[in-house]
């Protein structure tokens, strides 16, 4: 008997779901949200039970990887229990989480016990003052303590996510890489996404391509092409000097990954986003609440939604905003 498969109209298999569990965050990163962000009222967001119901239907339809995001997922009460329930779904191979690391000093061990398989931790600077400037509120030492707690809890292939911005942190690329090597962490360098209207910097001036990052790395290390994949947008390389870790590049501008896109996103409001860089979406919250106890209705809505998944985004790295919603509203 063949496994169920979600397929879009371009014959791309969709088996990876990113689920935002909150739009709230204890940081205010300059590329992610406005400093005076207004968050959604509680009645407007999905309950944990509703999030679980969506996860159940996606896994039944062939999803093999789920990533929980935010906002900062670990500020949502009850998220560890949600992880335990999602991790237990038959057929799911990976339950991952993207976090800023601020809560990991106390939650890394419970997350590992709950069945979370991998963590991505955002880290854009190793300079405490610059880290505070980029996050507006973050404490670098607390995040590093969280990274160490993740290693101590038993997580492997923990990955650092670094958004590289010209003139802000591009000079730290190799220092971040050395930090990753020292702690046996993977790392992905990310081109800034043009989501939301920001005021801290000009995206046209701060754009730093993946090719430029590789050139900077080559000043200190030897990059070796790799066929590694985590079923996400990162294209991986290895280092001759540290072959045990993976170096990823997420390049929505310079080398977009649309042709092999295998993922969709669920916002905390219950909108199923079919593309990070477009507004094509389906309101799954409305389906859930109009049809309690009828999972087949939700399943049909998910299957039908695949037919409006676009071929690609239209990101550019000028100061034009392609998508008005901020990253924390999208699911980072």
UniProtKB/Swiss-Prot annotation:
Residues 9-220 form the Radical SAM core domain. Its EC number is 4.1.99.22. PROSITE patterns: MOAA_NIFB_PQQE, RADICAL_SAM. GO terms for molecular function: 4 iron, 4 sulfur cluster binding; cyclic pyranopterin monophosphate synthase activity; GTP 3',8'-cyclase activity; GTP binding; metal ion binding; S-adenosyl-L-methionine binding. [4Fe-4S] cluster 2 binds at residues 258, 261, 275. GTP binds at residues 18, 67, 98, 159, 263-265. One of its GO terms (biological process) is Mo-molybdopterin cofactor biosynthetic process. S-adenosyl-L-methionine binds at residues 31, 71, 122, 193. It catalyses: GTP + AH2 + S-adenosyl-L-methionine = (8S)-3',8-cyclo-7,8-dihydroguanosine 5'-triphosphate + 5'-deoxyadenosine + L-methionine + A + H(+). Its cofactor is [4Fe-4S] cluster. InterPro entries: Aldolase_TIM, Elp3/MiaA/NifB-like_rSAM, MoaA, MoaA_NifB_PqqE_Fe-S-bd_CS, MoaA_twitch, MoCo_biosynth_MoaA/MoaC, rSAM. Pathway: Cofactor biosynthesis; molybdopterin biosynthesis. [4Fe-4S] cluster 1 binds at residues 25, 29, 32. Keywords: 4Fe-4S, GTP-binding, Iron, Iron-sulfur, Lyase, Metal-binding, Molybdenum cofactor biosynthesis, Nucleotide-binding, S-adenosyl-L-methionine. Binds 2 [4Fe-4S] clusters. Binds 1 [4Fe-4S] cluster coordinated with 3 cysteines and an exchangeable S-adenosyl-L-methionine and 1 [4Fe-4S] cluster coordinated with 3 cysteines and the GTP-derived substrate. Belongs to the radical SAM superfamily. MoaA family. Monomer and homodimer. PANTHER family: MOLYBDENUM COFACTOR BIOSYNTHESIS PROTEIN 1 (PTHR22960:SF0), MOLYBDOPTERIN COFACTOR SYNTHESIS PROTEIN A (PTHR22960). Catalyzes the cyclization of GTP to (8S)-3',8-cyclo-7,8-dihydroguanosine 5'-triphosphate. This is GTP 3',8-cyclase. The lineage of its organism: Bacteria, Pseudomonadati, Pseudomonadota, Gammaproteobacteria, Pseudomonadales.
């Amino acid at each position: 008997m063949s496994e169920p498969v979600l397929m879009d109209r371009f014959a791309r298999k969709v088996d990876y779901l990113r689920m935002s569990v909150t739009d709230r965050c204890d940081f205010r990163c300059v590329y992610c949200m406005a400093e005076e962000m207004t968050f959604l009222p509680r009645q407007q967001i999905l309950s944990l039970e509703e999030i679980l119901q969506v996860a159940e239907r996606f896994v039944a339809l062939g999803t093999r990887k789920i990533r929980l995001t935010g906002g900062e997922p670990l500020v949502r009460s009850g998220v560890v229990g949600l992880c335990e329930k999602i991790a237990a779904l038959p057929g799911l191979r990976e339950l991952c989480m993207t976090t800023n690391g601020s809560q990991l000093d106390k939650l890394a061990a419970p997350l590992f016990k709950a069945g979370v398989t991998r963590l991505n931790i955002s880290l854009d600077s190793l300079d405490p003052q610059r880290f505070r400037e980029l996050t507006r509120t973050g404490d670098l030492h607390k995040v590093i303590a969280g990274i160490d707690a993740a290693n101590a809890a038993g997580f492997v292939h923990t990955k650092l996510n670094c958004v590289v911005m010209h003139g802000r942190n591009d000079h730290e690329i190799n220092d971040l890489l050395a930090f990753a090597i020292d702690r046996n962490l993977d790392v992905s360098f990310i081109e800034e996404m043009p989501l939301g209207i920001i005021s801290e910097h000009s995206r046209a001036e701060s754009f730093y391509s993946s090719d430029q990052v590789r050139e900077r790395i080559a000043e200190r290390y030897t990059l070796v092409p790799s066929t590694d994949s985590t079923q996400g947008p990162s294209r991986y390389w290895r280092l001759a000097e540290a072959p045990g870790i993976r170096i990823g590049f997420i390049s929505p501008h310079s080398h977009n990954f649309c042709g092999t896109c295998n993922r969709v996103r669920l916002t905390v409001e219950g909108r199923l986003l079919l593309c990070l860089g477009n507004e094509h979406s389906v309101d799954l919250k409305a389906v859930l609440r109009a049809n309690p106890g009828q999972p087949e209705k939700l399943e049909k809505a998910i299957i039908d939604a695949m037919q409006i998944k676009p071929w690609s985004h239209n990101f550019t790295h000028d100061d034009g905003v392609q998508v008005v919603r901020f990253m924390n509203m999208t699911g980072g």
